[in-house]
Amino acid sequence: MKKYIVVTGASSGIGAATAKAFARRGENLIVIARRAELLENLRGEIANISPDSDVIVKPCDLSRSENVLALWDDLKSYELKALINNAGFGDFGFMGNHDIQKMVKMIDLNVTALAILSSLFVRDYKCKQTQ
């Protein structure tokens, strides 16, 4: 069975760069982010870098905990090698000017989703050989 490295926040920035770096090493990837079209673009770039790497695209808004749990259920059908828990965003500026709903979404993504995915990965893979 193929083993995959999961990269969240893979549509741009550090996440996309990380996915490409693993592709250069011949790894199979599951790339996750909200923006499906950017993930598809990334899949195309990776195909040029490493044609033998299998890249699975999973669009998902991880700021919603029900999506995080559904995603993990979906990922159970794959053998995972590593989780790069990179999804997140910031809202900069004077705290008194922050939009409260945006702040809640940021905490849900940066803290809640990260904690849930990390916990589930450790729970399900702590006794498995991932190499």
Regions found by a protein language model. Give the residues of each.
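Active-site loop of short-chain dehydrogenase/reductase
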Residues: 3, 79-80, 125-131
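Conserved glycine-rich cofactor-binding loop
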Residues: 11-13
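Conserved glycine-rich Rossmann-like NAD(P)H-binding loop of the short-chain dehydrogenase/reductase
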Residues: 25-42
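The beta1-alpha1 cofactor-binding region of Rossmann-like NAD(H)/NADP(H)-dependent oxidoreductases
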Residues: 59-70, 100
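Hydrophobic positions on the long internal alpha-helix
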Residues: 84, 117-121
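Conserved NAD(P)H cofactor-binding loop of Rossmann-fold oxidoreductase domains
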Residues: 86-91
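Substrate-binding pocket helix/loop in short-chain dehydrogenase/reductase
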Residues: 94-95, 99-107
